[in-house]
């Protein structure tokens, strides 16, 4: 049974927003720092991270149909800081894929007062906190 859970987790399709939900940035009340923390958390989990189009450039939107608005293609209208953050997350996931998907997960610190949580992944001599 426990082996089955590991296998299921390894093939999970992880997402934070979709065509059926409010966009991530909207759910975070346009708090980009919170959205980035959630994206980083998702990229540190087993399974496949899925990015809904526009999340990488800070597209917002309420429930359907506002979550399905057109992609913003004009670079000057995109959040380039968010895009660079996403590129760094993707690069980290590629570089440390084995650690992030096979490493031992340990919850280190939970601070409800400050809405803070910490975890680490360890594999052999590598550790990511």
Where are these regions (language model features)?
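Alpha-amylase-like alpha-glycosidases and glucanotransferases acting on alpha-linked glucans and related
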Residues: 1-49, 57, 111-113
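Active-site-proximal helices and loops of the catalytic beta/alpha 8
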Residues: 1-7, 31, 41, 60-88, ...
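Short, solvent-exposed loop/turn segments at secondary-structure junctions
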Residues: 18-22, 57-59, 78, 106, ...
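Hydrophobic, well-ordered secondary-structure elements that form the walls
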Residues: 19, 42, 54, 89, ...
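Short clusters of hydrophobic/aromatic residues that line enzyme substrate/ligand-binding pockets
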Residues: 24, 71-73, 99
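Short helix/strand-capping turn motifs
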Residues: 48-51, 65
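Amphipathic alpha-helical
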Residues: 85-103
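Carbohydrate-binding surface patches
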Residues: 108-129
């Amino acid at each position: 049974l426990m082996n089955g859970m590991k296998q299921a987790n390894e093939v999970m399709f992880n997402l934070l927003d979709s065509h059926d939900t409010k966009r991530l940035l909207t759910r975070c009340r346009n708090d980009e720092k919170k959205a980035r923390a959630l994206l980083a958390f998702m990229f540190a989990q087993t399974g496949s991270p899925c990015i809904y189009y526009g999340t990488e450039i800070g597209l917002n939107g309420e429930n359907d149909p506002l979550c399905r608005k057109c992609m913003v293609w004009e670079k000057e209208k995109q959040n380039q800081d968010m895009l660079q953050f996403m590129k760094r997350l993707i690069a980290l996931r590629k570089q440390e894929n084995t650690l992030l998907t096979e490493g031992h997960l340990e919850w280190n610190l939970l601070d409800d007062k400050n809405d803070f949580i910490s975890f680490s992944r360890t594999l052999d001599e590598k550790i990511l906190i």
